[in-house]
Amino acid sequence: MSDPRYPIGKFSYTGPLTAEQKQQYLTDIEQTPSRLRAAVRGLSDQQLNTPYRDGGWTPRQVAHHVADSHMNSYIRFKLALTEDEPTIKPYMENLWAELPEAKHAPIEVSLALLDSLHQRWMLMLREFTGAEWKRAFRHPDLGPMSLEKTLALYSWHGRHHVAHVTSLREKMGW
C-alpha cells in the first residue's frame, strides 16, 4: 500500500525545467484554489473535521495550511525578486495547524484568501521572462532555493494537499 502521507508521491525536482514543465506548474498553481474548493465542496463540519489518516490533518486544517503555506511562498518570491538571496524564516507548520483558528475557522475564509492570493501570485509569475526563475532565497534547512525549483515545489504542494482531501473522500465514500 502506498504511503497515505504522500498520495501523489514525494516532491522531486530534476531541473532545470522545460518551458512545457513551467507552463504546467504555472497552471497547477493557478488552479490550486479551484481544485481545493472542489475537493472540499459539500463536506459537512463533521467531515471537515475528519483526519485523512491516523495522526493526519483534517480537510479543514489542510485548507487553512494551504493558505498559510502559499502566503509564505508568495512573500518568499517577492523577497527573492527584490533582495540578493535573502534568508527566509521558516515557520512551524505543524504547530500552525494546531492553532484554534486552523482547527475551527470556516474554510471559506482560507478559500477566499487563496482565490485572491493566487490571482496576485499569477500576475507576478506570468511576467517572468527568464532571469527571474534563477533568483533564489536561502532556506535555513534546505539551502538555496531557486524560484524555478520553488515553482515546481508549490505545483506539487497544491496537488499533494488536494489529494489528501480527495483520497479521504474516496476512502470514506463521500
Annotated model-derived regions:
Residues 17-27, 83, 104-105, 112, ...:
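Solvent-exposed interaction patches of small proteins and small membrane subunits
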Residues 28-39, 96-134:
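Acidic/histidine-rich alpha-helical segments that form the ligand environment
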Residues 25, 51, 99, 110, ...:
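Generic anion/oxyanion-binding catalytic loop in active/binding sites
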Residues 1-8, 12-14, 49-94, 119-123, ...:
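Short, contiguous alpha-helical
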Residues 20-53:
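Short, contiguous, helix-prone interaction/anchoring segments in small proteins
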